[in-house]
Amino acid sequence: MLAKRIIPCLDIKDGQTVKGTNFVNLRQAGDPVELGRAYSEQGADELVFLDITASHEGRKTFAELVRRIAANISIPFTVGGGINELSDVDRLLNAGADKISINSSAIRHPQLIDDIAKHFGSQVCVLAVDAKQTENGWKCYLNGGRIETDKELTAWTKEAQERGAGEVLFTSMNHDGVKTGYANEALAELASQLSIPVIASGGAGQMEHFRDAFTLGKADAALAASVFHFGEIKIPELKSYLCDQGITVR
């Protein structure tokens, strides 16, 4: 069994790490360079950096901050936010990113997935999906959860896989920041439909939630933000707990 990954996420707004609940009510959570270094030293398997206002505000992710974080960590680094064309990908990879996460731009221009996979390899392309459970199933949203689309979660992620996405980062907007556990039923459905890794996001509040994402949700990795930023869960203790639960971690 492949080792499960634990991934802290830095949600960046105006150069600072922030964390909200259900995608709103953002509060400060610390200096991203310091947090990135700390997580790398504590044994995080990867780090994700999402410039959460880039797509909404229509500006480019600041490569300089990416460069500073990358210089201070020794783990794989995924960067997302405001990536609309291959030149954006090139700039961020040159700044030290290992993978690129695309969300709104992929829904608007699905060909971008094909282009990134062709030019840089599928392993670079992470499809991020913000989805909300509605009466009509799981619907995908644009621009940091602000605009509902007609894309259905499973159908869209399957299309992205066919186009060359190497991973899916699925955030449940219903669960984001509320710390009651991940969307395990939806995760398990994705895992059964896709052959690429699925990263769980949205809902971590205690160690059991990570266990459940891996056992019930069949996720390959679990991402969290506030529980790590505010010291509620420490990564070495989490890995020790998961190991005791019979889950293979790095």
UniProtKB/Swiss-Prot annotation:
The keyword Zinc-finger does not apply. GO terms for biological process: L-histidine biosynthetic process. It catalyses: 5-[(5-phospho-1-deoxy-D-ribulos-1-ylimino)methylamino]-1-(5-phospho-beta-D-ribosyl)imidazole-4-carboxamide + L-glutamine = D-erythro-1-(imidazol-4-yl)glycerol 3-phosphate + 5-amino-1-(5-phospho-beta-D-ribosyl)imidazole-4-carboxamide + L-glutamate + H(+). The lineage of its organism: Bacteria, Pseudomonadati, Bacteroidota, Bacteroidia, Bacteroidales. Heterodimer of HisH and HisF. Its EC number is 4.3.2.10. It comes from Bacteroides fragilis (strain YCH46). The active site is at D11, D130. NCBIfam families: hisF. This is Imidazole glycerol phosphate synthase subunit HisF. Pathway: Amino-acid biosynthesis; L-histidine biosynthesis; L-histidine from 5-phospho-alpha-D-ribose 1-diphosphate: step 5/9. IGPS catalyzes the conversion of PRFAR and glutamine to IGP, AICAR and glutamate. The HisF subunit catalyzes the cyclization activity that produces IGP and AICAR from PRFAR using the ammonia provided by the HisH subunit.
